[in-house]
């Protein structure tokens, strides 16, 4: 595929993510459509900006673009994770947050309650709070995942337990992780924290 077609496809994929965000932003009673009183002007977070962290136990890179703490946005967050080939996300659920996952690039297998669904570039998954889910990169290349929580807040789990890129890694006990998981309403389906 030539560079023009690739650039066009990436532009359309990003546009699709924006359309989904706008549509869901206007749905009633799910937290997306309410503007926080302290955010009165729009803003842009550029490609190289955001909070670049290494996640808690496995020290995987992610970029939190919009968060409750850093941007004052209460109703939705926005993050990006580049999942390496073979990476498996533990099956878990969020008790307090709905989640949207957009597969910007790559392919994988999404667990959604008892279903196993193949996903690829351009696919979007809506995961209501309380739904078991996980994502495995089964492709030959990295999987670029864009994800959002509504209401915002769960991204703070990554901030609290992760490490800013370039800083010494935070070391926590399994008991400390369990306390944070309870605080942010995350439950793992299995009890093996080393996964």
PLM regions and their residue ranges:
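Short, conserved beta-strand element in jelly-roll/cupin
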Residues: 82-83, 96-110, 148
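Short beta-strand His + acidic residue motifs that chelate non-heme Fe in jelly-roll/DSBH
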Residues: 91, 110, 127, 133-139, ...
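N-terminal secretory signal peptides and thylakoid transit peptides that target proteins
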Residues: 1-19
